[in-house]
């Protein structure tokens, strides 16, 4: 993926300045299918970007932040773990028109719904006409910006963290690797599409010795139809990311019983006893959401506060 070699891949603001304008030492090491970029700042902040090449012409990267100094770091904000441009042919600006663009030529964004408690869960319609945001899944010079995010700190609530940008027979699929609140912004440029993804509202500093990683991204360019691209993506996930069938892992998923986390202790124990009593061939018991928070009706507001509900 040549376009990655000439880009910084991520961005953030450090103590009010664009990171790439700050005083720092940058080193790049290549080791086979992996490239490691390190940024060392005078105050001891160390940023490590690790890029791995996968099958199906895909790349993955993740950022690590570490305080190697003796004092707290400066403030890290506006952190975009992915900030790159995917090359696409230029589109001419056409100005206002009462007609929809040519559906066979316009750039489309397949951005599936997440869990929305409806018949449209994980459904993507790039030609949807929304009265409040006309064609929210098209990217054109006249409508160059689109923004997507999830809800409630749950990675696939309202919006799933998977995207497919396609123009005619060329496209790119990418996914955000984060289990909390994320944000994705797309901008049509003369050179292509600027893709930015991040953990929403980052604003933090690191104490001496602290080290964290932030969200990851996997990006896969393709040529051909949407169906071909989706199958290419499935092969990538199965071969490089799924644990099923890998050394030390079973060839199939476990057969489990799902129990609502808001159920009382007595209710949970009763069901486990019934499983044992009737020798139901369950391999595992899986506890769903609701075991945390202040009450059964408030579980959705307490994601991230993993304090068990004593009731």
Q: What is the role of each PLM region?
A:
Residues 188-207:
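Short acidic, Pro/Gly- and aromatic-enriched capping/linker segments at domain boundaries
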Residues 186-190, 308-311:
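Short, intrinsically disordered, charge-balanced linker/junction segments flanking boundaries
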Residues 1-186, 200:
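Polysaccharide-binding surfaces and accessory modules of carbohydrate-active proteins
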Residues 55, 69, 178, 199, ...:
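Short, flexible loop/turn elements at secondary-structure junctions
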Residues 248-311:
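Aromatic-lined carbohydrate-binding/catalytic grooves of carbohydrate-active enzymes
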Residues 12-13, 60-81, 213-218, 251-259, ...:
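Catalytic cores of glycan-processing enzymes that make or break glycosidic bonds
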Residues 220-254:
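Terminal connector regions
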Residues 204-223:
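Short Pro-Gly-centered flexible turn/kink motifs
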